[in-house]
């Protein structure tokens, strides 16, 4: 192959790579506007889309051999693994069958609806014996959905089996998944997947990718090992300065509360705090319910010196008086005007007119079709608060444990753990302390660098490393308590995953604290900002039972691996910001520092991108077990793939020499981090989908 052909091949490969990334991004936004069926027909399942991936695979394979990558075993196997995955996906797209089947109790069925339109027949029949829903003890929250079936083969052989969430029934290459059920529990809906070859080939690609990535990290000739030995990481001469400031709030005293108002005495309220009740499909201490109630209404976990328990008890005992207490937070100025109130706190009676008609009912009729209207959101929030008070007055909010012994009470240890968790605002403390330490230490570090003052191994540096270890341990305690209280791994919603990302950031900072002087300040800053977002987004995260489909150790691993990748990408981004700042200020005098930051970023890029890839495909395995398909082009899946593809480009320094240039590399990783933000926040708030926490 001549040089001209090689250049053409490289340009075609790069152009096609960029085109596919762009097409994927555009498709997610089109899906949000025109719906999933449209993008499936014109993008994901269209011939041109299949052709693009095919050409990319073929040209990529030719390019790999043209570059003689077989001489680098790990790199060669990594690229071959992607080709194997594409082949598996092609087999699935061409020969795989997917459909849905409905079966009534006591009946047999052998026909299913394939691709939503075609009636297809199974080589056997399946009979539904019973459909049941199991619940969490003492609650109405479903723990699992189970279809008990009998498979009847043509030779009269019968096979019994249960199909439930994360429990698939496989028979003669067909896989059955629990999808839905009839409201009267007399029938079940099962998803069907028949793709024995495509799944096997794709899984082979996943395994090959994981093994080659591990091989790359440990191979003596790999770029990762070369970066580990780079002298820039061995001669860092920076130090830290920390001025620790204790942040505290002046407590509101009981004297600030108007004493003329009838209230529930504190001595009785305190004694009731550990009383066990049913709330949000969990057994909780009364303190949890009271705290949620007060925080929902007033925006704070206490009210003018009264504890949350006193607030709830006072509403119960003296409802007529408390209906005229302005403690219902209304943030929307427009809604304040419509309710006729001054300020941001309303009374319960402000929501009803002189004829005792509910004011929000008429408002809702005018805004219910405006999904993005701020007033609509304000009306919904206010209505939830009024509904909460109504439930309390009707006796449906507080439910005691049944006396028949059907529900086992919580142990005293678990009750005390939840009371402690409610009392200590882990997220608030951590984000305030971490951001304060992070900003001060980074400011001092930059001052020292500008002045060329080396202060290596100082007392302040050791203190900083000790403090970030303390922050990690304190954060670990909060995450552990959250998991212990909820009896599950706390990674099932947006708040919990952000908490875990922050934990990963602190963990990485502690792990790499000796590699660069910037690691510890970055660890404090990055974790602090993540915790701030978590705190602002959900100041009162309710602990609820996990959805049945989320009960999977594979899902927990999937989320954990991706969160660690996000944390590393965050460090790389902060490295880029500082490196570009120093380069713009005086690149010659700060050359050593810039080199250290660049090497550190390139070093972290390996585990970050490898974890991203492995996390994506662990998620694909979980999806195949739970939903019957390993890839659905859901917006979150698509943007995770985009993130992986974008960051993977930075490894190709020989094909794209610009990545060897310091400024270009750091600008690239800054722009690339936008894909991480889009994957985590953008999809949730803009695009939606099965993975969205909306």
Where is each model-derived feature located?
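Solvent-exposed, non-transmembrane regions of integral membrane proteins
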Residues: 1-694
């Amino acid at each position: 192959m001549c040089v001209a052909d090689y250049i053409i091949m490289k340009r075609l490969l790069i152009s096609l790579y960029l085109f596919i990334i762009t097409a994927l991004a555009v498709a997610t936004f089109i899906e949000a506007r025109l719906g999933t069926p449209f993008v499936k027909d014109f993008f994901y399942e269209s011939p041109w889309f299949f052709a693009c991936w095919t050409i990319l695979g073929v040209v990529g394979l030719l390019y790999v051999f043209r570059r003689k990558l077989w001489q680098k075993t790990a790199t060669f196997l990594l690229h071959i693994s992607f080709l194997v995955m594409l082949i598996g996906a092609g087999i699935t797209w061409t020969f795989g069958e997917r459909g849905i089947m409905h079966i009534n109790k006591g009946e047999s069925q052998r026909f299913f609806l394939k691709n939503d339109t075609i009636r297809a027949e199974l080589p056997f029949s399946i009979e539904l014996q019973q459909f049941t829903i199991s619940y969490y003890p003492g609650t109405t929250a479903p723990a699992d959905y189970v279809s008990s079936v009998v498979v009847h083969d043509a030779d009269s052989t019968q096979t019994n089996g249960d199909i439930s969430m994360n429990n698939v029934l496989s028979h003669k290459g067909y896989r059955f998944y629990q999808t839905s059920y009839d409201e009267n529990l007399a029938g079940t809906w099962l998803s069907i997947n028949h793709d024995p070859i495509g799944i096997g080939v794709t899984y082979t690609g996943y395994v090959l990718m994981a093994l080659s990535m591990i091989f790359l990290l440990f191979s003596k000739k790999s770029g990762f090992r070369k970066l580990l030995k780079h002298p820039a990481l061995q001669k860092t001469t920076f130090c830290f300065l920390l001025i620790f400031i204790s942040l505290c709030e002046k407590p509101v005293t009981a004297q600030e509360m108007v004493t003329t108002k009838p209230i529930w005495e504190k001595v009785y309220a305190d004694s009731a705090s550990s009383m066990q009740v049913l709330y949000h499909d969990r057994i909780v201490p009364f303190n949890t319910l009271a705290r949620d109630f007060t925080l929902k209404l007033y925006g704070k976990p206490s009210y003018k010196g009264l504890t949350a328990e006193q607030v709830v008890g006072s509403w119960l005992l003296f409802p007529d008086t408390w209906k005229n207490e302005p403690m219902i937070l209304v943030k929307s100025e427009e809604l304040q005007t419509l309710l006729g109130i001054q300020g941001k706190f309303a009374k319960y009676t402000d929501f009803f007119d002189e004829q005792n008609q509910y004011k929000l009912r008429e408002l809702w009729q005018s805004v219910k079709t405006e999904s993005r209207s701020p007033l609509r959101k304000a009306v919904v929030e206010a209505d939830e608060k009024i509904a909460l008070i109504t439930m309390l007055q009707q006796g449906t909010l507080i439910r005691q444990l049944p006396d028949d012994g059907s529900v086992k009470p919580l142990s005293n240890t678990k009750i005390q753990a939840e009371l402690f968790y409610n009392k200590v605002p882990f997220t608030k403390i951590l984000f305030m302390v971490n951001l304060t330490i992070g900003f001060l230490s980074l400011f001092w570090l930059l001052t020292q660098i500008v002045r060329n003052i080396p202060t290596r191994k100082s007392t302040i540096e050791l203190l900083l490393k000790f403090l970030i270890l303390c922050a990690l341990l304190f954060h670990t305690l909060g995450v552990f308590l959250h998991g212990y209280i909820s009896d599950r791994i706390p990674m099932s919603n947006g708040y919990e995953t952000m908490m875990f990302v922050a934990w990963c950031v602190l963990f990485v900072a502690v792990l790499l604290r000796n590699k660069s002087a910037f690691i510890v300040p970055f660890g404090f800053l990055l974790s602090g900002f993540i915790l701030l977002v978590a705190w602002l987004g959900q100041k009162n995260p309710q602990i609820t039972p996990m959805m049945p489909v989320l009960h999977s150790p594979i899902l927990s691993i999937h989320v954990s691996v991706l969160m660690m990748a996000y944390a590393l990408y965050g460090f790389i981004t902060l490295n880029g910001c500082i490196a570009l700042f120093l380069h713009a200020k005086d690149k010659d005098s700060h050359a050593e520092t810039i080199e250290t930051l660049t090497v550190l970023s390139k070093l972290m890029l390996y585990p970050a991108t490898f974890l991203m890839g492995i996390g994506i495909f662990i998620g694909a395995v979980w999806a195949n077990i739970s939903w019957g398909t390993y890839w659905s082009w859901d917006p979150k899946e698509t943007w995770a793939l985009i993130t992986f593809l974008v960051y993977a480009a930075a490894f190709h320094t020989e094909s794209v020499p610009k990545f060897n240039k310091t400024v270009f590399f750091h600008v690239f990783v800054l722009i690339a981090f936008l894909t991480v933000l889009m994957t985590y926040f953008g999809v949730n708030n803009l695009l939606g989908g099965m993975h969205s926490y909306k």
